[in-house]
Amino acid sequence: MLNQDQLFEKAKSSSLYRKILNSVLYKMVPFNKPHRFQIDKIDDDSITVKLPYIKRNFNHIKGVHACALATVSEFSSGALLLRKLGRKYRIILQKLEMEYHYQGKSDCYATFSVDDNWLKENVFSPLESEEKIVVPCIVKTFDSDENLISTATIKWQIKSWDKVKTKA
């Protein structure tokens, strides 16, 4: 059985393993299953998640619903942070801010990127002296025609599991 790191690693280059990873994520986060989010692309420092243009993701004028855009933004940043941070840290959503630029009328793609330098500067170094930190993560979502649909700022609280008082 593959562990989380192995599954993410294989999903970088294999559509079969991306499909398996998406199935696992549907089970881990059942709230997202009806939206049919799919990890479209993943590499060492970024992830792109597809928000399909399907009826359950529509608003009242058959555009992509604002809440679906917010949820795919949270999902993409959370998935990459979990992959990069591993099991040592707990992440929990503190705040989510959305700015909507254009009405989505096709599949949308939310992309989040962080590199090791960003993690060192914004997560690991601050956690050496703080019990918990809050990091802002910027997620941009584009439609199939490359129109900028939304920009999300997701603030994640990060804390070492050994400092958490209420266990999962």
Question: Which residue stretches match the model-derived regions?
Answer:
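Non-catalytic linker/capping segments at the edges of enzyme domains
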Residues: 1-48, 167-168
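Residues located in well-ordered beta-strands
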Residues: 38, 97-99, 111-113, 140, ...
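Hot-dog-fold acyl-thioester-processing enzymes
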Residues: 52, 57-76
